[in-house]
Amino acid sequence: MTDRLRPIPPEDWTDAQRAAAQDIINGPRGALYGPFVPLLRSPELMGYAQKLGEYLRYRSAIGVRLSELAILVTAREWDQQVEWAIHAPIAQQVGVPPDVIDAIARRERPAALLVDEAVVYD
């Protein structure tokens, strides 16, 4: 698959792009990938998107376990294989049971959901 917007080579980054990229690399993501590659064309917007995404994924009130469960349910619903491949192992690491992950992968409602997981799933 070809990128519609080719990545900007690091040697061509402006000072603002370099600073925005470094903020993401130094943050919890640890690397510049996914939507941040084309967003680098607008470093100010990229900064706002990064802050929103960081909050939703890492610091929201529902916690990391339920956040990862929501990501898996959404990834499966919309056939987002890359998101699934990235987040299924993370979900297991943060406490989503393997049988829950497997059921979602099969597009089935997991049989043994905790109350808070059922709220997210349903």
Predicted regions and their residues:
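Generic alpha-helical structural context detector
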Residues: V37, I71-L72
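Acidic, glycine/proline-rich low-complexity segments that act as flexible tails and inter-domain linkers
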Residues: M1-I62, P97-P98, R109-P110
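General N-terminal targeting signals
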Residues: Q22, G30, L56, V73, ...
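Alpha-helical ds-nucleic-acid-binding substructure associated with the helix-hairpin-helix region
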Residues: D99-D122
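A generic alpha-helix surface/boundary motif
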Residues: D3, G30, G47-L52, E68-L69, ...
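Conserved alpha-helical segments that form or flank metal/cofactor-binding pockets of metalloenzymes
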Residues: L45, I62, L66-E68, T74-V100
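Short acidic/histidine-centered micro-motifs embedded in hydrophobic/aromatic stretches
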Residues: L52, L72-V73, H87, I104-R107
